[in-house]
Each structure stands twice: as structure tokens, then as C-alpha cells.
């Protein structure tokens, strides 16, 4: 009998492609702050910390194209390229920095 390991995920053999078919955008982001900023996989990128400098208006309704539950850390003074994908589902955003609090497509 095989024993289960708590939290273990058993997948089929082969590669798993995350977020396939999503229209990804590549964006350059600079941290102009004096502290590291960490952004989680499903955080509405448009509403991230103001010390992150990028073309903010094109990120409305977008999140990082990284596995769920992970994050990217932007160190002070660093410039990083990231990939973003659009939210799916009902496309509503509530919370974060309270800039939207409703539908993303209205």
C-alpha cells in the first residue's frame, strides 16, 4: 500500500501547460521604493504598490502568469520583466486597493 503525503499532488506523466490559450502580455516593472514588494499570483496587477513603475493602464484586469499560490518579489531598485494574463470567470475585482470594486469590463 502506498502512503499519502499531506499536500502531495500526483499528476499524469508529461508536461502541464499553465494558462494555455491566455493572451499574455510582457511588461517591464521597476521597484522605485526602498523595500521589497511581493505580488501574489492572483493579485490584480493594476492595483499593486505605487512604488512599482510600469504602464499601469494596460494592466487593468490582469494578473501574473505564474502558478497559483506563488509570488514574484521585486527588490528595491530592480527592473524585472513579467508576463501577465487576463482574469477569467465573472471578471469582477473587489478589495486589493479598492480602485475597482466591481466589474473589470464596464
Curated annotation (Swiss-Prot):
One of the GO BP terms on file: urea catabolic process
Q: State the coiled-coil residue ranges.
A: none
- One Pfam family cited in the UniProt record for this chain: Urease_beta
The record's Gene Ontology cellular component field reads: urease complex
Its domain of life? Bacteria
Its pathway is:
Nitrogen metabolism; urea degradation; CO(2) and NH(3) from urea (urease route): step 1/1
**Which terms in the Gene Ontology molecular function aspect does this entry carry?**
urease activity
Please state what the protein is called: Urease subunit beta
InterPro entries in alphabetical order: Urease_beta-like, Urease_betasu_sf, Urease_subunit
Q: Which UniProt keywords apply?
A: Cytoplasm, Hydrolase
Similarity remark: Belongs to the urease beta subunit family.
**Gene3D superfamilies per the record?**
Urease, beta subunit
Q: Which reaction does it catalyse?
A: urea + 2 H2O + H(+) = hydrogencarbonate + 2 NH4(+)
Amino acid at each position: 500500500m502506498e502512503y499519502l503525503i499531506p499536500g502531495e499532488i500526483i499528476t499524469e506523466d508529461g508536461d502541464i501547460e499553465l494558462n494555455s490559450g491566455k493572451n499574455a502580455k510582457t511588461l517591464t516593472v521597476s521597484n522605485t521604493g526602498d523595500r521589497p514588494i511581493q505580488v501574489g499570483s492572483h493579485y490584480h496587477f493594476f492595483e499593486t504598490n505605487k512604488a512599482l513603475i510600469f504602464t499601469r493602464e494596460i494592466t487593468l484586469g490582469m494578473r501574473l502568469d505564474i502558478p497559483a499560490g506563488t509570488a514574484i518579489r521585486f527588490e528595491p531598485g530592480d527592473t524585472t520583466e513579467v508576463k501577465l494574463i487576463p482574469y477569467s470567470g465573472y471578471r469582477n475585482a473587489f478589495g486589493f486597493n479598492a480602485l475597482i470594486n466591481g466589474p473589470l469590463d464596464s
